[in-house]
Amino acid sequence: MLPFSSSRFSSGLKMIPQQLFTKEDSNDDNIFYATPRLVKHIDENACQVLTNYYDQLLRDGDAVLDLMSSWVSHLPDHKHYSRVSGQGMNQIELQNNSQLTDFHIQNLNNEQQLPYGNEEFDLCTIAVSVQYLTSPVQVFKEIYRVLKPNGTCCVSFSNRMFPMKAILAWRIFTGEDHCRLVAWYFEMAGEFREIQSEQLVSKNSNFDPLYVVTAKKILV
């Protein structure tokens, strides 16, 4: 557990300048992601640790939304899901994801509104991709909308990225500051509760580091 983690974890951040959400490569993301990448972006140890972590969050019968998905969703195979919906940028990658029951192509940097009704999902995941969002608060507001009451959003990340497509804030921050940044997204989205961060794989290990930031939709 990171030292600043708690059930009342606060990012400690105020407003973030808009320039920190710019990218080195400002060309259309659709061009960059047109070529399928059927590779894993974290090592096998981090993948298994993430799957084990998801297993703790999930119940049989849950509906899952995998945002910024690819050809793997890292969900535990032994669980039964009522639905696993994926959103991504490359059709071939999503077609190769055997865990998805349905998917759609959407560039969240161009259009943040999700094509789902209110309160459809028990869990929303964003795995090793949050660093590419240029309008993250708007996306997190949509996540809140589509989550069921008591639903959870889990954002995971490592130290890997496509530097030209990651926002400036991600490139200049480090692991624990990345946690604060993602917590700030949850805070600015307005209604999330129980924001927590955890380091699942140490940056001092011989494996890829892995962090998660989670928050719940708790109606008060």
Regions found by a protein language model. Name each.
Residues 49-114:
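Class I SAM-dependent methyltransferase SAM/SAH-binding core
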Residues 137-152:
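A short glycine-rich, Lys/Arg-flanked "PGG" loop and its adjoining helix->strand segment in the class I
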Residues 190-191, 199-220:
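Core SAM-dependent methyltransferase catalytic element
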Residues 4-60:
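Class I SAM-dependent methyltransferase Rossmann-like catalytic core
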Residues 111-124:
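A short acidic, Gly/Pro-enriched loop at the edge of an enzyme's catalytic core
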Residues 152-184:
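Conserved class I S-adenosyl-L-methionine
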Residues 122-137:
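A short SAM/SAH-binding and catalytic strip from SAM-dependent methyltransferases
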